[in-house]
Design a protein with these regions (language model features):
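Hydrophobic core of transmembrane alpha-helices in multi-pass small-molecule transporters
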Residues: 81, 96-114, 300-317
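A membrane-interface helix-boundary motif in multi-pass transporters
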Residues: 155-175, 358-378
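Helix-to-loop junctions at the C-terminal end of transmembrane segments
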Residues: 56-70, 157-158, 261-274, 360
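Cytoplasmic membrane-interface "Motif A"-like loop-to-helix N-cap segments
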Residues: 65-80, 137, 162-164, 271-283, ...
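Juxtamembrane intracellular "pre-TM" segments in multi-pass secondary transporters
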Residues: 1-4, 189-217
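C-terminal ends and interior cores of transmembrane alpha-helices
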Residues: 76-94, 283-298
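Helix-loop boundary and gating motifs at the non-cytosolic
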Residues: 1-56, 61, 210-251, 322
Length: 390
């Protein structure tokens, strides 16, 4: 019976979708870019693409029709647009990285409104008193599946000559993404409450002073994260000495731990509220770069320990950020609130990525990655302490 059938389908849909999302925006596409000869600045731009795409989230307010139908169509087209990235390695050397960035960017730009549409749809499917537990479990499970995918993808990439292994994994990812769209079509969509016009919905959200303050912290947080974020995997590979298989194993450790921590944070959110989870998880995420910077080829255990810290932080943080936004939003203007949330996230991440490229170009530290990661640590800590006042 509904909505239980659709909630179960959503988990299976997410299992397939996360393979595409992880491989097309994370470890595998970063390794592919390195194999194609990407510079630190190109890596920073690649890391910025998901946040750049968020700038198009306001389009969700102007799209007319069923949230389900729109999400299905946009996801299908976005998956198909990513296909040319796998062929970039066959182009002349000077065109490989630009082609990768172009089609990866177009794919993410096209999918940008889906976040608002899907979250609004799911908010109607999942009762408010269940959101912490449901999304805590779903996100932890998808984290495990995604990182098992990273492990298998890394093994393929290590065993085939570069960049052939990366190309094979990305093609499989597109296939999984297309299958997820089929499952998305099978889920039911509750009737949507009448929404105010787009400008009015945005105006209602913007005039909410408490919410505006929250958006400022979301902006600052993702900016702080992305100052060092694009360089974590390159740091693991080039400074920590990890192979792509070992990077995949790192993510498996993190995701496996997340299966324990995610439900724990979900229960805490349902009991104490999402703001309590926000501060605790943000503090862990803020201090985590200390472990990265302590690791090296000769002394790798802090890098492996950071997998546990990563799970402890992000198994609760991402969900708490989105659910805190939903908690602010009145149902009739929910999409306006969500659009501003995704915009704050995207603008913060984009600014952080731009700062990352500039910081890496200064040439400070033993590698181009040390200074941006250290700077990210300081900025994260400053924002995390401000989250305590929410």
């Amino acid at each position: 019976m509904e909505p239980e059938r659709s909630l179960k389908l959503s988990i299976w849909e997410g299992v397939l979708a996360i393979l595409f999302l992880n491989w097309s925006t994370g470890v595998i596409v970063t390794g592919y870019a390195l194999a194609l000869g990407a510079s630190p600045q190109a890596l920073a731009l690649l890391g910025a693409l998901p946040f750049l795409a968020q700038l198009l989230t306001p389009l969700a307010l102007f799209l007319r029709g069923s949230r389900k139908a729109l999400a299905v169509r946009l996801n299908f087209l976005a998956r198909m647009l990513f296909l040319p990235t796998a062929l970039a390695a066959f182009l002349p050397e000077g065109l490989r990285v630009p082609t990768l960035l172009l089609f990866a960017g177009l794919s993410q730009l096209l999918a940008a409104p889906v976040g608002v549409l899907w979250l609004s749809w799911m908010a109607d499917l999942v009762a408010e008193e269940r959101r912490g537990r449901y999304f805590g479990f779903r996100n932890a499970l998808l984290g495990l599946v995604g990182t098992l995918g990273n492990l298998m993808g890394g093994m393929v990439a290590d065993r085939l000559p570069p960049p052939l292994g990366y190309q094979a994994v990305l093609l499989v990812g597109v296939g999984a993404g297309l299958l997820s769209v089929l499952l998305l079509r099978l889920q039911s969509e509750p009737s949507e409450s009448p929404s105010p016009p787009a400008r009015r919905a945005l105006g209602i959200a913007w005039q909410d002073l408490a919410y505006r303050g929250y958006l400022g912290l979301v902006f600052l947080w993702y900016g702080a994260v992305m100052v060092g974020g694009p360089y974590v995997i390159p740091y693991f590979v080039q400074v920590g000495g990890l192979s792509m298989t070992e990077v995949g194993l790192w993510t498996v450790i993190s995701a496996s731990s997340g299966l324990l921590f995610g439900p724990m944070w979900g229960r805490m959110a349902d009991r104490e509220g999402h703001k309590a989870v926000l501060f605790r998880t943000a503090m862990v995420a803020a201090l985590m770069p200390l472990l990265w910077l302590s690791g090296s080829r000769a002394f790798p255990w802090p890098v492996w320990l950071s997998a546990i810290a990563d799970a402890l932080a992000w198994s609760g943080l991402g969900t708490a950020l989105a659910n805190a936004a939903l908690a602010h939003a009145p149902k009739e203007a929910r999409n306006g609130y969500l659009v501003l949330f995704w915009l704050a996230l995207g603008l913060g991440g984009l600014l952080g990525s731009l700062l990352a490229g500039s910081a890496a170009s200064l040439g400070l530290g033993p590698s181009p990655y040390h200074f941006p990661i250290l700077l990210s640590l300081g900025l994260r800590l400053g924002v995390a302490l401000r989250l305590r006042r929410l």
